[in-house]
């Protein structure tokens, strides 16, 4: 009798000895165990090294075209409006230039925005907005001009 069959018999005999019904059909099924040698095809190794999905905690560029997405533009408007109310400023959003994101109990959005200053000059700012959409929560974390960045 093979070792795997002995294992199956001992499991079912022990179960029967414990007062449970014995399943004769399963006792006859040999148990096969597969052991991995840790080796695989080169394609499997390469696939294992490829990043999957979003890295939690890492800041990454948003997919192309996200700058014109309605949700992103609304976040940028929110950031400019919050900054204006806190700093008593009169900036106007012109466009979203770049979007980066970070997963942190929601999303931290890093928005590079072009704004028009009261004098008429356009300038680039970096806005950092924390959003938890499922709670309808968003908060401006930071809003600062990019050094020597005139659009």
UniProtKB/Swiss-Prot annotation:
Q: Where is the Cystatin domain?
A: 57-147
A GO biological process of this protein is: defense response
A Pfam family assignment: SQAPI
Gene Ontology molecular function: any one:
cysteine-type endopeptidase inhibitor activity
Keywords (A to Z) from UniProt: Plant defense, Protease inhibitor, Thiol protease inhibitor
Site Reactive site — annotated at 57
Question: Keyword Acetylation: yes or no?
Answer: no
Q: What SMART domains does this protein map onto?
A: CY
> What stretch of residues is annotated with the motif Secondary area of contact?
102-106
Q: Does the record's keyword annotation contain S-adenosyl-L-methionine?
A: no
Q: What does this protein do?
A: There are two distinct cystatins in rice seeds (Oryzacystatin-1 and -2) with different specificities against cysteine proteinases. May be involved in the control of germination by inhibition of endogenous cysteine proteinases. May play a role in defense by inhibiting exogenous proteases such as those present in digestive tracks of insects and nematodes.
> In which family does this protein belong, per the annotation?
Belongs to the cystatin family. Phytocystatin subfamily.
**Protein name as catalogued:** Cysteine proteinase inhibitor 2
Q: Name the species this protein comes from.
A: Oryza sativa subsp. japonica (Rice)
Task: Specify the taxonomic lineage.
Answer: Eukaryota, Viridiplantae, Streptophyta, Embryophyta, Tracheophyta
């Amino acid at each position: 009798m093979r070792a795997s069959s002995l294992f199956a018999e001992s499991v079912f005999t022990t179960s029967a000895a414990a007062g449970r019904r014995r399943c004769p059909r399963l006792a006859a099924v040999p148990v096969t165990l597969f052991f991995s040698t840790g080796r695989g095809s080169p394609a499997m190794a390469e696939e294992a090294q490829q990043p999957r999905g979003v890295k939690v905690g890492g800041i990454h560029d948003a997919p192309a075209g996200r700058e014109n997405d309605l949700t992103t533009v609304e976040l940028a408007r929110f950031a400019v409006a919050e900054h204006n109310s806190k700093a008593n400023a009169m900036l106007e959003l012109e466009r979203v230039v770049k979007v980066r994101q970070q997963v942190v109990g929601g999303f931290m959005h890093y928005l590079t925005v072009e704004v028009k200053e009261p004098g008429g000059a356009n300038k680039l700012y970096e806005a950092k907005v924390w959003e938890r959409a499922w709670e309808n929560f968003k908060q401006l974390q930071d809003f600062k001009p990019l050094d020597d960045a005139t659009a």
